[in-house]
Amino acid sequence: MDDKKNEDVEMRNFNGRSSPSQRDPFISKPGAAKRGGSSFDLSNVTNSPGISILAYCLASISMTVTNKYCVSGSNWNLNFFYLAIQSVVCIIAIIICKQAGLITNLAPFDTKKAKTWFPISLLLVGMIYTSTKALQFLSVPVYTIFKNLTIIVIAYGEVLWFGGSVTPSALFSFGLMVLSSVVAAWADIQHALYGGGATQTKEAADALSTLNAGYAWMGMNVFCTAAYVLSMRKVIKKMNFKDWDTMFYNNLLTIPVLFVCSFVFENWSSENLTKNFPLETRNNLILGMIYSGLATIFISYCSAWCIRVTSSTTYSMVGALNKLPIAVSGLVFFAAPVTFGSVSAIFIGFVSGIVYAWAKVRQNQSKGSVLPTTQPVMSASSQSNRDAAKA
């Protein structure tokens, strides 16, 4: 998911906090490994910034590639079922890790918290479903580029509801994100219409129809993702969730919703199941579905690991830089069209991610260096929320 959809997966699993108390029970602390007489010291690996960054990048790329592989079959139409299997595998993995003592800060299931969190889970279903549909119709590079538009919607949502602000450098990065999306769409449409050197044909019309469906799903995903992130931010402060609690409730509460949606809206006839799971690729597809569930754990682990041994600043820059290999993976593994337009769009999107990460770093540094002697400017709705909280 996802991102994949790796961005979707991170938002699905983690609440964005990175306090050591929430990460350390799962990731070894520096010096925690035993220093015996053996030549190999595990702490050299667990405390290596380079290895943690590489692991995070590989986990993100593998998640995106796996999701694209699973949903890109010519007859695939069981997206709800696929996402349900992901959540089931993730929950099983969390329970096993807890029983093995790898996760020690997962609180027992609370029915009251589940009821409060359930609306957020419904928004999550909308986010991950539209994400897989967009990935099904669009190439990985185009999907990755358009995913940046979510950042813009979330940023202005924070301005409206949480009193956030948009700096000039962030605004410049938003312009680059929009430009990269326009260039990517133009390159995609040009390749669909004239990629074979011919003029408009039935095949070109079908390809254009597929792209239009992908853009429609991508647009819905942008707003579903923003709604999920902003709503989660508003509710999570009341829940006192730790990172693994967020992952557990998100995946557990979506399981019944996804299965019900699958049984109601998807075709479960034997003929359709055979089309979705053809004999020649059935085993690989099942393995991919299982791995995609485990990959949500891997990405969450690698995210916390990367933040622990580097810094949140480095992690944000790695996330921006990671856009490039994810987009390139689509060119390598799925034969996405390599044209001047597509390469230019990838490059512009890559630069926009770096500029945005740099803008956020500067904004955070300026906040930390200025004493809060005045009341910050905020929107009316944000002020009313703050006044209500004080009441």
Swiss-Prot record:
What keywords are assigned to this protein?
Cytoplasmic vesicle, Endoplasmic reticulum, Glycoprotein, Golgi apparatus, Membrane, Sugar transport, Transmembrane, Transmembrane helix, Transport
Query: Per UniProt, what is one GO molecular function of this protein?
Result: antiporter activity
Q: Where is the composition biased (Basic and acidic residues)?
A: 1-11
Q: Name one GO biological process term.
A: GDP-mannose transmembrane transport
Task: Cite the InterPro entries for this sequence.
Answer: TPT_transporter
Topology feature Cytoplasmic, residues: 1-44, 97-115, 165-170, 231-245, 306-313, 360-391
Lumenal topological intervals? 66-75, 139-141, 194-209, 267-284, 337-339
Per UniProt, what is the membrane topology?
Answer: Multi-pass membrane protein
The answer to keyword Transmembrane applying to this record is yes
Q: What is its main location?
A: Golgi
Signal peptide per UniProt? none
**Membrane-crossing residues?**
45-65, 76-96, 116-138, 142-164, 171-193, 210-230, 246-266, 285-305, 314-336, 340-359
Q: Name one GO cellular component term.
A: Golgi apparatus
The annotated region (Disordered) lies at 1-28, 369-391
Q: Where in the cell is it found?
A: Golgi apparatus membrane; Cytoplasmic vesicle membrane; Endoplasmic reticulum membrane
Q: Which residues are glycosylated?
A: 267, 272
The record's family statement is: Belongs to the TPT transporter family. SLC35D subfamily.
Function text: Involved in the import of GDP-mannose from the cytoplasm into the Golgi lumen.
**Record text on subunit structure and interactions:** Homooligomer.
Query: What protein is this chain from?
Result: GDP-mannose transporter
Species, as recorded: Sclerotinia sclerotiorum (strain ATCC 18683 / 1980 / Ss-1) (White mold)
